Amino acid sequence: MGHSKVSKANTHARLVEAAAARFKERGVDGISLADLMKDLELTHGGFYKHFASRDELVTEALELALTQSGQAMRDRLFSGDKPDIAGFVDVYLDESHRDGRAAGCAVAALAGDAPRKSAEVQAQFRKQIERNLEALSEALGPGSADESRATALLILSALYGALTMARAVGDSPLSREVLRTVRKQILNLSGPAGKPRARAKAK
């Protein structure tokens, strides 16, 4: 690949990465193309060398944000010899995650935008949430597939909802109460004494 093509590919990647972070921080409609390009010290007109439209950037940026969040979730759940649901929940419902939207969970940050976007965007969310459910179901361990999925769905919904609510009320006693209470209830679901259930041994 020639130098100009490498440079263009690098700029394209920078645009997608920056958009993914800013969308999580401000919402999909919370930053203009002009501001995004200015933040990256690029010309507004140069945008169309990389994308046919803003919607095309949105699609790519959401794909990146959702994939990265999903991979971070899986990495945290399976970082040791045994699944660590407690560790994942601790990190997810930490105040630093509440306050760090740009580097945090894309589903919690952007799910509110999805109903107003295209069917393609909604399909992206659906695909990633299914992947997240699969990862959490696997981490939960023994039990029927239906039971594990139901528990995983309840936990994920509680996580997304708690983070959204905690952010909505700002850094306040209520915000901290939401994080603390939901964490405790989730750990009661995920195994005895708040510890992750052991996975079934391979036969």
Report the location of each language-model feature:
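Amphipathic, non-transmembrane alpha-helical scaffold segments
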Residues: H12, V16, L62, L66, ...
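Helix-turn-helix
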Residues: R14, A18-V58
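Alpha-helical DNA-contacting segments of helix-turn-helix folds
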Residues: F51, V58-A65, A72
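Hydrophobic alpha-helical connector segments
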Residues: E60, R74-G104, A152-I155
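Amphipathic alpha-helical segments used for helix-helix packing
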Residues: D84-G87, D99-R126
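Hydrophobic/aromatic-rich alpha-helical bundle segments in the mid-to-C-terminal region
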Residues: A119-K127, L140-R197, K201-K203
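Active-site oxyanion/phosphate-handling segment shared across diverse enzymes
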Residues: I129-A139
